[in-house]
């Protein structure tokens, strides 16, 4: 059975742009990157994380002051891969606007709430899910104990990040993330994960850019 992601990538449309040097063809994602749009789509893993971080760093080099727009539709994934994206978002100089379309679960929700304050959005039918990290280990008892200690430290660190970006107190975050907690876009707004639920694009904001 073919990899569904590979199948989708083979169907990525090309767009043709007219320039004074003639025509130039781009795949649709490269063309959107020119508009400072990045997609975080699908499971968060090392390969995807590397590409997203590279795009963030490239856009910073292109213009260190102009906003970057990150569109998120992700079920989450590997914590360390997501943290690489998170740290890069905080590290670069341009503000990163985030928008959830579809879902932002697990690490996807952390990346959504990590956007620049006032610029974290969700479409009306988006779903957001937060929870504590999970994992499984096997081996010697002492190694299992060390892994357990490490994931507890990671849980604490993730809770602190949600506290920072939502304004909620630590105990509230810990209780909310104890089990899978699903939210509508409106509930995510009330919780502090996002700043606005958007139904249509703000045309006036686009015209002012």
Swiss-Prot record:
Catalytic activity: Hydrolysis of proteins to small peptides in the presence of ATP and magnesium. alpha-casein is the usual test substrate. In the absence of ATP, only oligopeptides shorter than five residues are hydrolyzed (such as succinyl-Leu-Tyr-|-NHMec, and Leu-Tyr-Leu-|-Tyr-Trp, in which cleavage of the -Tyr-|-Leu- and -Tyr-|-Trp bonds also occurs)
Catalytic EC class: hydrolase
Signal peptide: none
Pfam families: CLP_protease
Keywords, sorted A to Z: Cytoplasm, Hydrolase, Protease, Serine protease
Documented EC number(s): 3.4.21.92
Any single Gene Ontology cellular-component annotation: cytoplasm
A single GO molecular function term of this UniProt record: ATP-dependent peptidase activity
A biological-process GO annotation: protein quality control for misfolded or incompletely synthesized proteins
Protein's cellular compartments: Cytoplasm
Main location: cytoplasm
Keyword Lyase: no
Active-site residues, Swiss-Prot/TrEMBL: 106, 131
Top-level lineage group: Bacteria
Keyword Hydrolase: yes
InterPro entries per record: ClpP, ClpP/crotonase-like_dom_sf, ClpP/TepA, ClpP_His_AS, ClpP_Ser_AS
PANTHER family: ATP-DEPENDENT CLP PROTEASE PROTEOLYTIC SUBUNIT
Family note: Belongs to the peptidase S14 family.
Known partners and oligomeric status: Fourteen ClpP subunits assemble into 2 heptameric rings which stack back to back to give a disk-like structure with a central cavity, resembling the structure of eukaryotic proteasomes.
Function: Cleaves peptides in various proteins in a process that requires ATP hydrolysis. Has a chymotrypsin-like activity. Plays a major role in the degradation of misfolded proteins.
Protein's name in the database: ATP-dependent Clp protease proteolytic subunit
Organism expressing this protein natively: Brucella suis biovar 1 (strain 1330)
């Amino acid at each position: 059975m073919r990899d569904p992601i590979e199948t989708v990538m083979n169907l990525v449309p090309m767009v043709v742009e007219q320039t004074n040097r003639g025509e130039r063809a781009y795949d649709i994602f490269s063309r959107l990157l020119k508009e400072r749009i990045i997609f975080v789509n699908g499971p968060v893993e090392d390969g995807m994380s590397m590409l997203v971080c590279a795009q963030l760093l490239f856009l910073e080099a292109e213009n260190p002051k102009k906003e970057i727009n990150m569109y998120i539709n992700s079920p989450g994934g590997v914590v360390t891969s997501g943290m690489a994206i998170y740290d890069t978002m905080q590290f670069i100089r341009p503000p990163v606007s985030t928008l959830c379309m579809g879902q932002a679960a697990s690490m996807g929700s952390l990346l959504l709430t990590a956007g620049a304050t006032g610029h974290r959005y969700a479409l009306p039918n988006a779903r957001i899910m937060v929870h504590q990290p999970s994992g499984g280990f096997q081996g010697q008892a002492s190694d299992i104990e060390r892994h357990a200690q490490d994931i507890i430290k990671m849980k604490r660190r993730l809770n602190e990040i949600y506290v920072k970006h939502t304004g909620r107190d630590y105990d509230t975050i810990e209780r909310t993330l104890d089990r899978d907690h699903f939210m509508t876009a409106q509930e995510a707004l009330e919780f502090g994960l996002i700043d606005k639920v958007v139904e249509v694009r703000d045309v006036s904001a686009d015209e002012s850019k």
